């Protein structure tokens, strides 16, 4: 087990680091309200929405956490040419990120919409295009990430299997970071660990590790 003092030192060091994060962004919508009746149209609860919250999730959550710990974060990701993608761009501004998402006109921005009554989640609806990037967009990701990594101290690859981190992008970025002597940390949702060959650290949770072995 890592000593607490070492963890504190590592977190403190983040305040002076620049981190390049590349990966899948999602738009997380939360609709909070109350349930007082069942719909006459179907046997489902009717949520009276009282409050709505939006934030960037998936790799965006990694970036938000890095910023919260004092790091200077850069973010390379892809959204669709839709209202959700526009909202992600505005949330980038709220986080004071100097980056803007790459826009793929053939792609739908990954969005998760949750309806919550009290402490109970009633429903989650997903919109996404979980397929690999076309070569043109893939190359834009590689080129932008290469430029950003040159200004950073480390590389975080946040792979939620939505297509941004292709095999080619992973191989080129991990190789580039290694040549530059910069550590590579992988945050993943999946079981294909061979794709991250050359990374310094992979961070599965217990279930993901069990699935992989």
Predicted region positions:
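Ribokinase/PfkB-type carbohydrate-kinase core domain
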Residues: 1-36, 48-213
């Amino acid at each position: 087990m890592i000593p607490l003092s070492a963890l504190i030192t590592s977190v403190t060091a983040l305040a002076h680091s620049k981190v390049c994060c590349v990966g899948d962004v999602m738009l997380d919508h939360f609709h909070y309200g109350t349930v007082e009746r069942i719909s006459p149209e179907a046997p489902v609860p009717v949520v009276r929405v009282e409050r709505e919250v939006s934030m960037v999730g998936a790799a965006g959550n990694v970036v938000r956490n890095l910023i919260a710990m004092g790091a200077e974060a850069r973010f390379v990701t892809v959204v669709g040419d839709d209202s959700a993608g526009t909202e992600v761009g505005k949330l980038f501004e709220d986080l004071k990120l100097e980056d803007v998402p790459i826009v793929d006109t053939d792609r739908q921005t990954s969005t998760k919409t949750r309806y919550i009554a009290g402490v109970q989640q009633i429903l989650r609806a997903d919109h996404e295009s979980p397929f690999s990037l076309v070569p043109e967009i893939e190359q834009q990701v590689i080129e932008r990430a290469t430029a950003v990594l040159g200004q950073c101290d480390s590389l975080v690859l946040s792979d939620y299997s939505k297509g941004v981190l292709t095999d080619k992008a992973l191989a080129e970025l991990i190789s580039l970071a290694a040549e530059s002597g910069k550590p590579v940390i992988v945050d993943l949702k999946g079981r294909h660990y061979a794709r991250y060959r050359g990374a310094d650290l992979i961070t599965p949770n217990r279930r993901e590790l069990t699935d992989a072995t």
